[in-house]
Design a protein with these regions (language model features):
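Residue register of alpha-helical TPR repeats
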Residues: 48, 87, 128-130, 171-173, ...
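Residue signature of alpha-solenoid helical repeat architecture, marking inter-repeat boundaries
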Residues: 44, 82-85, 119, 124-126, ...
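Amphipathic alpha-helical segments of tetratricopeptide repeats
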Residues: 70-78, 111-121, 153-164, 196-207, ...
Length: 270
C-alpha cells in the first residue's frame, strides 16, 4: 500500500479493498473483525467478510494471499456451519492446486466439500455447481479434457435448472471454460458456438468479466478453422485487445500482441 493510497484513504477519496483491510489487520496484529467493523461492511458478520476477501483473491488470482487466509482460518475455527466449512474446503483446494500443484489432494478436498451438502447430482445448488466447476478446471489443467467437458456440461445443465440464480456470472464462467476446453480438443466450431453464447450473456449482464477472454477465444478458434475471414478475425481480436487494455490485464495484452498482432505484422511486412 503506497503513501499516496494511504493519503487517499485518509481523505475518504477511495475505499481500501477487502484484501488490503485483511492485510492491514495482520500487520497491526489485531482482529480483522475490528477493522471490518469500521468499514461500510460493519453489518456483515466476520465470516462473511472473510469469504468476500477470499472470493476477491480468487477473482484477482492472488493465490498466495488466499493461501495465508485459508491457513489462518483453519487454525482459528471461525468457519463452523456446514456451508462455511464447505466454503473453506473449496478454497483450500484452490490454493493446494494453484500454489502447491497437488491435483490429487485438491480433488480429494473438493469431493469432501461436495459431500457435505450433496443430495442429488441432477439438482445441484449454486455453490455445488461452483465446486464442480472448480473440479472441471483442475481436470482441464491436468489435460483430462473429456472429464472436464463432461463436468462442465453437467454444471451448465444444472445452472439452467436454477429458478433464481444469485450470481449469473457463474454461468458465464462455465461457458467460457467449456469453450476453452473444446478449443483444446480441436472442437473449434462448437467452441465458437459457446464463445458467442458467452459474449451475448456478458453483454446482457452488462459486465466486462471474461468478455475480452471470450472474444480472444473466438478469434483463436476461428484461426484454427481452414476457412476463416481474416477481417472478421482481426475485428474480434481488436475488440479483445481493447477490453484487455480497458481492464488493465497486462498478461493478456502481452499474449494477444505476441500471438496475433505481431504475427499479422510479419505477414504484411515479411
Amino acid at each position: 500500500c503506497s503513501q499516496s493510497q494511504i493519503s487517499k484513504i485518509e481523505k475518504g477519496m477511495i475505499y481500501p479493498s477487502s484484501i488490503l483491510l485483511y492485510q492491514l489487520s495482520e500487520r497491526l496484529g489485531i482482529d480483522p473483525n475490528s477493522i471490518f467493523a469500521l468499514t461500510q461492511n460493519k453489518k456483515l458478520k466476520y465470516v462473511e467478510n472473510v469469504k468476500y476477501v477470499m472470493r476477491d483473491c480468487t477473482k484477482q488470482k492472488q493465490y498466495k494471499e488466499l493461501y495465508e487466509i485459508v491457513k489462518q482460518e483453519k487454525n482459528q475455527n471461525n468457519f463452523q456451519s456446514t456451508e462455511d466449512k464447505q466454503f473453506l474446503l473449496w478454497h483450500e483446494a484452490i490454493v493446494i492446486f494453484m500454489v502447491n500443484k497437488s491435483t490429487k489432494i485438491a480433488l480429494n478436498l473438493l469431493n469432501h466439500a461436495l459431500k457435505l451438502t450433496l443430495t442429488n447430482m441432477d439438482c445441484l445448488s449454486e455453490r455445488e455447481i461452483e465446486i464442480m466447476q472448480t473440479m472441471a478446471i483442475f481436470h482441464g489443467e491436468n489435460k483430462e479434457y473429456e472429464k472436464s467437458i463432461n463436468i462442465l456440461r453437467r454444471c451448465l445443465t444444472n445452472f439452467n435448472k436454477l429458478d433464481f440464480p444469485r450470481d449469473k456470472e457463474i454461468k458465464l464462467k462455465i461457458i467460457f471454460n467449456l469453450a476453452k476446453i473444446l478449443g483444446h480438443t480441436n472442437q473449434h466450431e462448437e467452441a465458437i458456438k459457446y464463445n458467442d453464447i458467452g459474449i451475448k450473456l456478458a453483454i446482457n449482464l452488462n459486465t466486462l468479466y471474461l468478455l475480452g477472454e471470450l472474444y480472444y477465444g473466438k478469434g483463436w478458434n476461428l484461426l484454427r478453422l481452414k476457412q476463416n475471414n481474416e477481417e472478421d478475425v482481426a475485428d474480434i481480436m481488436k475488440k479483445a485487445l481493447f477490453i484487455f487494455e480497458l481492464t488493465e490485464k497486462e498478461y493478456l495484452i502481452k499474449i494477444i500482441k505476441e500471438n496475433y498482432f505481431e504475427n499479422q505484422n510479419k505477414k504484411k511486412h515479411p
